[in-house]
């Protein structure tokens, strides 16, 4: 009896297998072909666009990491023969190393940070604040409207526009004076007028009500403030 049931089971299994084989998709047939062509194209383009956007973001962020040779280079100030200046302490704070790297893109700004004879207040946004911007610091919506989304930053002229935008971003976060007193209106290197007020134990920069996380460093030529968001630079 058991042997008979086993034989019947084997026969049934073989029969079902042959049916499934006959219903198999022909070689080379893709389930993707069952989708309407227009939908396939849209999904494909969205996937490629997503990859491009992600790659662009990762590439941009990787370029903003501080140059290791600059970050750890020794000078007479590092050895204690001179007091440190803002340019010495700025790249050492990992929370703001994106902004620190941007300041090194422009020789006049870097020189000012390194000048012990001229006081300065650096308002450095945290990395997370820059990363959460709706657009890159070098992007300007007006450029896209005037030159188009594709060619706004292509070629030498496009690169120059991007560099100018980036410089404005950095200059909007630097005040050529220190100390900066509460309620005192000061003009940034970019020409914007700012002041700060204190609410409880928190400091807020106006306009924009930008919260100061902390005053990280006080050195011979000024102070380094860390911000929880970016200042208006347009």
From Swiss-Prot:
Its main location: other. It is found in: Vacuole. The keyword Signal applies. Keywords: Signal, Vacuole. Residues 1-21 form the signal peptide. Residues 83-231 form the FAS1 domain. GO terms for cellular component: vacuole. SUPFAM superfamilies: FAS1 domain. InterPro entries: FAS1_dom_sf, FAS1_domain, Mug57-like. This is FAS1 domain-containing protein AFUA_8G05360.
